[in-house]
């Protein structure tokens, strides 16, 4: 007990020296949090020190591994499984772009396990908007898993799948600032997708998150941050990418002006309240909505389609995503998910 009690101040001291924790140390720390072994005052100091130093890939990977193991899920026996969950928190108030992308990718015949939550920032989260459109967030875990085979997509409402994380809620509420927990959500999908597209709220997180995905054993992934400040690829400025493929991470820049896309500022992508965001999502998935709304979904879907191996390049992905949106197939997927989880 004394040895464990001594560990937490040691980790704090290491972080205050601006030295990152190893994966093993990060695992120890997360286990300590989940089992209420770390004193509150030390926990707050550790979270602040992590944030001030800048979270590392080893810290993210170690913590995520523990949280994923502690979830109620287990790997699905599928060779290809995609998630499009981002960090959120960019403050831009866009409509639910990555949620729309999930249904486009599913309509392309790729199994999708969308992991998400309600918004923590007063905006509209993926869970909020899908619930407004009829998705049952309280479906039994077995039914949520079965939807992947039956519908081609499912939605995992994070709080139902991560009961162990209740232990850290008090720290997050008390601090009221960003912490490492804002980054862990996309890394801990309980159904273990092997391919991911993750938007992050700050450019410096792109290589860090991509390396964390490599350490966690993902096959292919793209981490992105638009220079407009979005955790999505935007239509006005280039987007910085961290691409994981073949066990290596490389950086690349995606310029929307290289493609036949509607140039549009962030303001053209903004949502509103819950009803407004639900209406935009429904319109876009049915092939209507504003051109900029459709194009930003097509662009981001292209990244996911390429990660999934469904298209050879982003241009082909944009074209396929546009066809899917125009056909209403993505809306059909949503309706099938609503009906399946309601039964």
UniProtKB/Swiss-Prot annotation:
<protein>
    <recommendedName>
        <fullName>Anthranilate phosphoribosyltransferase</fullName>
        <ecNumber>2.4.2.18</ecNumber>
    </recommendedName>
</protein>
<keyword id="KW-0057">Aromatic amino acid biosynthesis</keyword>
<feature type="binding site">
    <location>
        <begin position="89"/>
        <end position="90"/>
    </location>
    <ligand>
        <name>5-phospho-alpha-D-ribose 1-diphosphate</name>
    </ligand>
</feature>
<keyword id="KW-0460">Magnesium</keyword>
<feature type="binding site">
    <location>
        <position position="172"/>
    </location>
    <ligand>
        <name>anthranilate 2</name>
    </ligand>
</feature>
<dbReference type="GO" id="GO:0000162">
    <property type="term" value="P:L-tryptophan biosynthetic process"/>
</dbReference>
<feature type="binding site">
    <location>
        <position position="94"/>
    </location>
    <ligand>
        <name>5-phospho-alpha-D-ribose 1-diphosphate</name>
    </ligand>
</feature>
<feature type="binding site">
    <location>
        <position position="126"/>
    </location>
    <ligand>
        <name>5-phospho-alpha-D-ribose 1-diphosphate</name>
    </ligand>
</feature>
<feature type="binding site">
    <location>
        <position position="232"/>
    </location>
    <ligand>
        <name>Mg(2+) 2</name>
    </ligand>
</feature>
<feature type="binding site">
    <location>
        <position position="98"/>
    </location>
    <ligand>
        <name>Mg(2+) 1</name>
    </ligand>
</feature>
<keyword id="KW-0822">Tryptophan biosynthesis</keyword>
<dbReference type="InterPro" id="IPR036320">
    <property type="entry name" value="Glycosyl_Trfase_fam3_N_dom_sf"/>
</dbReference>
<feature type="binding site">
    <location>
        <begin position="114"/>
        <end position="122"/>
    </location>
    <ligand>
        <name>5-phospho-alpha-D-ribose 1-diphosphate</name>
    </ligand>
</feature>
<feature type="binding site">
    <location>
        <position position="86"/>
    </location>
    <ligand>
        <name>5-phospho-alpha-D-ribose 1-diphosphate</name>
    </ligand>
</feature>
<dbReference type="GO" id="GO:0000287">
    <property type="term" value="F:magnesium ion binding"/>
</dbReference>
<dbReference type="Pfam" id="PF02885">
    <property type="entry name" value="Glycos_trans_3N"/>
</dbReference>
<dbReference type="Pfam" id="PF00591">
    <property type="entry name" value="Glycos_transf_3"/>
</dbReference>
<comment type="subunit">
    <text>Homodimer.</text>
</comment>
<feature type="binding site">
    <location>
        <position position="117"/>
    </location>
    <ligand>
        <name>anthranilate 1</name>
    </ligand>
</feature>
<feature type="binding site">
    <location>
        <position position="231"/>
    </location>
    <ligand>
        <name>Mg(2+) 2</name>
    </ligand>
</feature>
<comment type="similarity">
    <text>Belongs to the anthranilate phosphoribosyltransferase family.</text>
</comment>
<feature type="binding site">
    <location>
        <position position="86"/>
    </location>
    <ligand>
        <name>anthranilate 1</name>
    </ligand>
</feature>
<dbReference type="GO" id="GO:0005829">
    <property type="term" value="C:cytosol"/>
</dbReference>
<dbReference type="InterPro" id="IPR005940">
    <property type="entry name" value="Anthranilate_Pribosyl_Tfrase"/>
</dbReference>
<dbReference type="InterPro" id="IPR035902">
    <property type="entry name" value="Nuc_phospho_transferase"/>
</dbReference>
<dbReference type="GO" id="GO:0004048">
    <property type="term" value="F:anthranilate phosphoribosyltransferase activity"/>
</dbReference>
<keyword id="KW-0479">Metal-binding</keyword>
<dbReference type="InterPro" id="IPR017459">
    <property type="entry name" value="Glycosyl_Trfase_fam3_N_dom"/>
</dbReference>
<keyword id="KW-0808">Transferase</keyword>
<comment type="function">
    <text>Catalyzes the transfer of the phosphoribosyl group of 5-phosphorylribose-1-pyrophosphate (PRPP) to anthranilate to yield N-(5'-phosphoribosyl)-anthranilate (PRA).</text>
</comment>
<keyword id="KW-0328">Glycosyltransferase</keyword>
<keyword id="KW-0028">Amino-acid biosynthesis</keyword>
<comment type="pathway">
    <text>Amino-acid biosynthesis; L-tryptophan biosynthesis; L-tryptophan from chorismate: step 2/5.</text>
</comment>
<dbReference type="InterPro" id="IPR000312">
    <property type="entry name" value="Glycosyl_Trfase_fam3"/>
</dbReference>
<feature type="binding site">
    <location>
        <begin position="96"/>
        <end position="99"/>
    </location>
    <ligand>
        <name>5-phospho-alpha-D-ribose 1-diphosphate</name>
    </ligand>
</feature>
<feature type="binding site">
    <location>
        <position position="232"/>
    </location>
    <ligand>
        <name>Mg(2+) 1</name>
    </ligand>
</feature>
């Amino acid at each position: 007990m004394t040895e464990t009690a001594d560990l937490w101040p040691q980790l704090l001291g290491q972080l205050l020296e601006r030295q990152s924790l190893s994966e093993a140390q990060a695992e120890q720390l997360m286990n300590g949090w989940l089992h209420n072994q770390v004193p509150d005052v030390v926990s707050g100091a550790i979270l602040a020190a992590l944030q001030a130093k800048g979270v590392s890939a080893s810290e993210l990977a170690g913590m995520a591994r523990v949280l994923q193991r502690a979830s109620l899920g287990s790997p699905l026996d599928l060779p290809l499984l995609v998630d499009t969950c981002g960090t959120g928190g960019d403050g831009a108030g866009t409509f639910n772009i990555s949620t729309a992308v999930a249904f486009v990718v599913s309509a392309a015949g790729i199994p999708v396990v969308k992991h998400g939550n309600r918004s923590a920032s007063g905006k509209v989260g993926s869970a909020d908007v899908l619930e407004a459109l009829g998705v049952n967030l309280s479906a039994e875990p077995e039914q949520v898993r079965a939807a992947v085979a039956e519908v081609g997509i499912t939605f995992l409402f994070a709080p139902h799948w991560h009961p162990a994380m209740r232990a850290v809620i008090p720290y997050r509420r008390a601090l009221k600032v960003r912490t490492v927990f804002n980054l862990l959500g996309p890394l801990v999908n309980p159904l273990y997708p092997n391919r991911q597209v993750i938007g992050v709220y700050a450019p410096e997180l792109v290589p860090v998150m991509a390396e964390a995905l490599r350490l966690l054993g993902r096959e292919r992934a793209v981490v992105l941050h638009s220079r407009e400040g979005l955790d999505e690829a935007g239509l006005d400025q280039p987007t910085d990418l961290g691409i994981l493929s073949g066990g290596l991470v490389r950086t690349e820049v995606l310029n929307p002006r290289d493609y036949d896309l509607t140039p549009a500022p962030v303001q053209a992508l903004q949502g509103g309240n819950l009803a407004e965001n639900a209406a935009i999502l429904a319109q876009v998935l049915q092939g209507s909505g504003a051109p900029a709304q459709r194009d930003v979904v097509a662009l981001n879907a292209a990244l996911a389609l390429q990660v999934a191996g469904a298209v050879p390049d982003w241009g082909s992905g944009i074209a396929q995503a546009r066809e899917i949106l125009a056909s209403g197939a993505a809306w059909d997927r949503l309706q099938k998910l609503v009906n399946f989880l309601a039964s």
